[in-house]
Amino acid sequence: AADYVITGCGTGEGAMLALNSFPGVICGHVEDPVDAYTFAHVNDGNAVALPFAKGFGWGGELNLEYIFEKLFGFGHGQGYPKERVVPEQRNKKILDGVRAVAFRDLSDILKDLDRDLVKGAFAGEHFAEYFFPACKDEKLAATVRELMA
């Protein structure tokens, strides 16, 4: 239900690992604008994890501004350097194929997790308001409704 996720933690590593545990998510670790630009163009993922305890002191707002500029200002999947676009896009498709085989369906995963943990994740004040209208997967929506009951 989200097109792109921006998250983080102290080092960014834990948040990245957590997001990469889910099917359909390719999360990169972004510390600076170069990381943002190369992740967007080489890896073409859909999530980034930032290290909020590193490099975000004095001038940190500039670092964030430049990260978002490089992450979203020039498109995605265009290769870096540009002449590497074809092999990089080919490798991205290979990775997507591996991940499609390696990960289980999210509905099945949610059903096998601790029910209290899942219910807590869905308990946010506006979760249902935002999730259900944006959810494009009816099976997933039905699973979430079932688990929220």
What name fits each language-model region?
Residues 9-14, 55-56:
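Gly/Ser/Thr-rich loops at beta-strand to alpha-helix junctions
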Residues 14-27, 31-32:
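Short Gly/Thr/Asp-enriched flexible loops that form oxyanion-binding sites at enzyme active sites
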Residues 37-148:
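C-terminal binding/interaction regions
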Residues 9, 31-32, 51-52:
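Short secondary-structure boundary segments
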Residues 2-8, 27:
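A short, small-residue-rich loop immediately preceding and capping a beta-strand
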Residues 1, 149:
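Glycine-rich beta-alpha loop segments
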